[in-house]
Swiss-Prot record:
Location of region: Domain III, AAA+ region: 129-345
Location of the region described as Domain I, interacts with DnaA modulators in the Swiss-Prot/TrEMBL record: 1-84
Region (Domain II): 84-128
Function (record text): Plays an essential role in the initiation and regulation of chromosomal replication. ATP-DnaA binds to the origin of replication (oriC) to initiate formation of the DNA replication initiation complex once per cell cycle. Binds the DnaA box (a 9 base pair repeat at the origin) and separates the double-stranded (ds)DNA. Forms a right-handed helical filament on oriC DNA; dsDNA binds to the exterior of the filament while single-stranded (ss)DNA is stabiized in the filament's interior.
UniProt protein name: Chromosomal replication initiator protein DnaA
Gene: dnaA
Amino acid sequence: MSLSLWQQCLARLQDELPATEFSMWIRPLQAELSDNTLALYAPNRFVLDWVRDKYLNNINVLLNDFCGMDAPLLRFEVGSKPLVQTISQPAQSHHNPVSVARQQPVRMAPVRPSWDNSPVQAEHTYRSNVNPKHTFDNFVEGKSNQLARAAARQVADNPGGAYNPLFLYGGTGLGKTHLLHAVGNGIIARKPNAKVVYMHSERFVQDMVKALQNNAIEEFKRYYRSVDALLIDDIQFFANKERSQEEFFHTFNALLEGNQQIILTSDRYPKEINGVEDRLKSRFGWGLTVAIEPPELETRVAILMKKADENDIRLPGEVAFFIAKRLRSNVRELEGALNRVIANANFTGRSITIDFVREALRDLLALQEKLVTIDNIQKTVAEYYKIKIADLLSKRRSRSVARPRQMAMALAKELTNHSLPEIGDAFGGRDHTTVLHACRKIEQLREESHDIKEDFSNLIRTLSS
């Protein structure tokens, strides 16, 4: 019996679990087999508890399948084992909301002198820029951002570990910046003298230009390559800035070699960033890449309720649902609308009711209703799937037509205030039960298929922009 037993388990788990789950929870585990005990090491308590709660039975079943009566006992521990083990990763589609580079070994025991042993370097004054108001505690979690939050939490607990770099991507106002600051605050809480630097990518460019003008490029390099964690927002703004990309390429390599944490955000998947060198885009995907989706209705309601609570405002549930059903694109838009409602209520002394909200947000709501119509949804979906609008309205039942039709119906329910019968009528006079079935089918497929989930998110972004 040897570690090949765990490798067999890994191979089976890769086949049995969704790629996202395997990448997030199973891949970071390290294994040690001795005295008929298989010890699995998790990078932190969060991962340990999750794996033990969700996958303990799966692993025990596999051990019994492979070993029968000789199956080893299973033990979980937090920590790392001084061993590097490379496992074969499944091919990742660029449409996957979570991807981990195939060519990278699992880093079993990173040596992190900057985290554990090094004194604080006094040669620079570090501009942390981490906003203490953005933490994991006040980040509202939902299906749309659950994986991103979990990955960020793990990085905060174990910087420089398996998820380095961490790349978060998604549309504007979905919480990427909040998570960057939350990671920074988490690292600083763990080690107050850690050198954590947050910045927008344009600040990196500005600093480099200033260093070139002042003949201080070596000082620039020392500054950025000696941080413990570098958090860069909107990396897509490096596009077509060749000298900045060159400098960041070498900075990236230096930080990764030193097991210093890198977290990047963008509005698109790394390989889809135009104007950025392929060697950089490749490195962006070396660690963990996670998408943040537009928030679903329940998460939008939770965001509004939490924001109101932070402002000591009582927001009736029906009012929160009214706003959330009509403003769907991003968190920033939701919070801006609520701030407007609160300000109007404070100025007028009126209670916050649905009628009051309808009046306070009348121009915003009118704009939303004008932007997203069933006709617009049908046109956008037809163009996306390269079919005719007439196909969506027809009685054709081939998958190439039926699936886009179901997608369009689900989007109409999500993005408009039309009833199911009204939506059915707009799709060739179909019954409301057909619309309900379509919505449930798309919801199911979004859980099972990365491509369907990505299609849904792309269409939401297109229709909401």
